[in-house]
């Protein structure tokens, strides 16, 4: 028998996951099934991918962002090169760029507390933020 859509999603997720934080196929399958149960729209996914590929350069739009911005990127992301995150930071005035060695294109459970700390700090900075500076 051929691969099911869930089997294929597990395979793709594992391919782009974090080399330093491997996840079992069973765990990834559980996550994929939860998404599937939330009625993930596959046509919407493909529209999003097409829009991202055909979108114009965003540099000028990024320069308009004045809020404190947190960019988290995996140093081992095989889907979106880390240089894309570095480039984004250059164009967002109040951006903080944080990378994680060994992280791919996912959010490893082992790093969730660090993510939450960074996000909480960014929110706190935003509460007292003066966009005129």
Residue ranges and their predicted role:
Residues 63-66, 91-92:
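Short, conserved loop/helix-junction motifs that constitute active-site signature segments
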Residues 9-13, 89, 120:
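Non-transmembrane alpha-helical segments in soluble domains
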Residues 94-133:
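Catalytic active-site module of serine/aspartate enzymes centered on a nucleophile-bearing elbow/loop
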């Amino acid at each position: 028998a051929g691969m099911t859509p869930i089997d294929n999603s597990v395979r793709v997720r594992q391919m782009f996951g974090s080399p330093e934080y491997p996840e079992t196929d069973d765990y990834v399958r559980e996550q994929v099934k939860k998404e599937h149960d939330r009625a993930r729209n596959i046509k919407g996914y493909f529209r999003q991918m097409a829009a991202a590929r055909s979108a114009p350069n965003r540099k000028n739009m990024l320069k308009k962002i004045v809020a404190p911005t947190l960019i988290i990127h995996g140093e081992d992301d095989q889907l979106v090169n880390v240089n894309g995150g570095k480039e984004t930071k250059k164009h967002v005035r109040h951006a903080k760029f944080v990378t994680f060695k060994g992280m791919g294109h996912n959010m490893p459970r082992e790093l969730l507390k660090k993510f939450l700390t960074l996000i909480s700090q960014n929110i706190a900075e935003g509460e007292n933020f003066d966009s005129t500076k």
